[in-house]
């Protein structure tokens, strides 16, 4: 990353796009403490978090999904959510069922995660992130490999999170999803931020067009 600066406000959906290798996942890793930056700072709610471990950052209220699905195939959908909880089991189960209902998977709560479709597994991972009630949610390619019906359920859930006052930052290669969902889009190329703005502005930005298609 080279001098990348992002500022996120509560209750908004942001997109982070760029060609392959532009630094999108690296930026997510820096925010969540998986990778250490050489310079600069990461602040959340006015507090520097760049020196914290990943689990400490998660406890501050930042949740994140990954490009590669990370579910436990031999656990049920419900159990996959319960593995990240602390405290009373009854309260955790109620919260997990509420979240499965949030993405229309309550009826599959007892199904082994390994038997679910790829898209359903993505939804399980998505709501597992919500079990800790984060206020900033980072989604890494949420639409990849998801059929249209499940994708619509996921996008509706993201909008409802925004309406609850949460902030969502997503990396996504599906430009239709980005342009239809995000209110502000950041564009990276070779580790630098080359553009920032509303989707309509980004679509016509010459620097963005050149980054994707060349001259």
Please place each PLM-identified region on the residue numbering.
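Glycine-rich phosphate-binding loops of nucleotide-dependent enzymes
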Residues: 1-215
């Amino acid at each position: 990353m080279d001098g990348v600066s992002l500022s996120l406000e509560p209750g908004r959906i942001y997109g982070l796009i760029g060609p392959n290798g532009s630094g999108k996942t690296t930026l997510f890793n820096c925010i969540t403490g998986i990778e250490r930056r050489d310079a600069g700072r990461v602040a959340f709610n006015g507090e520097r978090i760049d020196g914290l471990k990943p689990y400490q950052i998660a406890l501050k209220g930042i949740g994140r999904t990954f490009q590669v699905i990370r579910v436990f195939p031999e656990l049920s959908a419900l159990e996959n959510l319960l593995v990240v909880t602390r405290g009373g089991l009854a309260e955790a189960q109620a919260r997990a069922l509420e979240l499965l209902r949030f993405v229309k998977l309550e009826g599959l709560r007892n199904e082994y995660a390994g038997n679910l479709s790829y898209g359903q597994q993505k939804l399980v991972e998505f709501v597992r992130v919500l079990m800790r009630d984060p206020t900033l949610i980072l989604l890494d390619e949420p639409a990849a490999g998801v059929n249209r019906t499940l994708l619509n359920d996921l996008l509706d859930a993201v909008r409802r999170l925004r309406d609850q006052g949460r902030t969502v930052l997503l990396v996504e290669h599906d430009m239709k999803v980005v342009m239809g969902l995000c209110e502000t889009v950041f564009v990276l190329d070779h580790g630098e931020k080359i553009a920032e703005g509303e989707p309509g502005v980004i679509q016509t930005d010459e620097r963005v067009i050149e980054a994707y298609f060349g001259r």
